């Protein structure tokens, strides 16, 4: 079995990575950078975002400040790799989103959206099926269930259970709206930067990274990908409990 290790280059994590390499070699795994069978993500949720987009099953080792979706403690690494070798694990599949703009396609694990970072609002048009709405504020995010535990939660204070087959449309700091989000079945949406009477430019973000800019009257499509992120589970993941603990509730 060939594994790739993904982590941030910090002194604390470098020690953990070396530990994983030694255990992997002892158990007969080959640690490589290309042509791998599995990805070992070492860190927190940010590292997991990078790992799932490599297209292989992920082993999620919790070694960061915030890792709500990481299930393997550092002191259980050898146990997890032994079980990987035996095939003793549960495979969980997670929804992925795609952002389409012109010829550009970007894959998102948590959320995709349009945001503004100037001290004024933008108006975003949202279209799906026969629905057409406009929301004025700092922007709009479209979130997966797992994404609702991240950026989306800071805007809505709500959580979608990870097994729910749905997406959440999140209104970021909306003006004059008490409604903060809408949960809908997995559908293709169009997000459009609407005209407020003068030109504006907004950021298109995928998992917290700016991937392109759009101008007034331009739009992006957000759709559910045919691909799934696969995370191998060795220990019970108590997402609700982790969220309550992380936010000291």
Swiss-Prot record:
Q: Which SUPFAM superfamilies match?
A: NAD kinase/diacylglycerol kinase-like
What are the GO BP annotations of this UniProt entry? NAD metabolic process; NADP biosynthetic process
- Which cofactors are required for activity? a divalent metal cation
Among the Pfam families in the record, one is NAD_kinase_C
Task: State the GO CC annotations.
Answer: cytoplasm
Q: Which domain of life is it from?
A: Archaea
Major site of localization recorded for this protein: cytoplasm
- Amino-acid positions noted as binding NAD(+) in the UniProt annotation, renumbered to this chain: 45-46, 50, 110-111, 138, 149-154
List the subcellular locations. Cytoplasm
Active-site residues per Swiss-Prot or TrEMBL entry: 45
Keyword Transcription regulation in annotation: no
As recorded in UniProt, its EC number(s) are 2.7.1.23
Reactions listed under catalytic activity:
NAD(+) + ATP = ADP + NADP(+) + H(+)
Keyword annotations for this protein, in alphabetical order, are:
ATP-binding, Cytoplasm, Kinase, NAD, NADP, Nucleotide-binding, Transferase
| A GO MF label | NAD+ kinase activity
- Family as reported in the entry's similarity comment: Belongs to the NAD kinase family.
Q: What does this protein do?
A: Involved in the regulation of the intracellular balance of NAD and NADP, and is a key enzyme in the biosynthesis of NADP. Catalyzes specifically the phosphorylation on 2'-hydroxyl of the adenosine moiety of NAD to yield NADP.
PANTHER family assigned to the protein according to its UniProt record, in alphabetical order: BIFUNCTIONAL NADP PHOSPHATASE_NAD KINASE, NAD KINASE
Query: What is the designated name of this protein?
Result: NAD kinase
Protein source organism: Saccharolobus solfataricus (strain ATCC 35092 / DSM 1617 / JCM 11322 / P2) (Sulfolobus solfataricus)
Its taxonomic placement starts with: Archaea, Thermoproteota, Thermoprotei, Sulfolobales, Sulfolobaceae
